[in-house]
């Protein structure tokens, strides 16, 4: 009996192939708790509920520091303290000021002075590195799928060719040697006629090659794979551009919301101050009115007792 392994979420036991590689989750738990990106820091986390769109770390920071602002380097909405996110702050302390990313052209790529840390020799920021690795992984998986499917189709065709050649073998054995000898002079006559006409001729072209069909099929499959790779690369570039635009639009929207919120808070503060000033003036006027009313009463009493 094959060994069973427990899912890290529901703790039910499944075969090893049925669990995911990273989180070791079963299929139902993967559907119920998908891996999503945090709205603020853009890191991937396991979603506990459908309404939960931010990771635990950002949720704690929101409780402590409030809604974050866009980072002045990477434009990610994760600057809880100051104008820079924690990732850019730590990278700046460790590697110095940021450089321009070769993909998104923003000043948010940090040079680690190590070519092994670069992506294909390019200096990319954190977001572009993740997107590039994701696209590369998808391309590898699709190429692997294409190669496996093409290999399976080739194996089927080879089996079919073996079966067909085996079925014809017995019938070909019954051919007489005289018919074979008659065919050879005919081919020689054709060869002599072609050589007499002065055309270049290769004997290998005239003979039947059983593997020619396979070579043609392999060449066609290679061309199809190259075309699909090219189309995939173009689509990946389009996806990267769209993700970049979506990130920029989200950042702009968050920035505008934060600006409007700050403006509303400032207006509420000024309104409160104006109301307090008006109330203070009102109290002073009431005091003055009370003092004036008290001063008029003794004057009236003195005017009555004078005769």
Swiss-Prot record:
One of the record's GO cellular component terms: nucleoplasm
UniProt keyword annotations, A-Z: Coiled coil
Domain of life according to the entry: Eukaryota
Paired cysteines (S-S): none
Similarity-based family: Belongs to the FAM76 family.
Disordered: annotated segments: 161-181, 287-307
Keyword Coiled coil: yes
Residue runs in coiled coils: 217-297
Biological classification of the source: Eukaryota, Metazoa, Chordata, Craniata, Vertebrata
Keyword Glycoprotein attached: no
Full protein name: Protein FAM76A
Ranges that cross the membrane: none
Organism: Gallus gallus
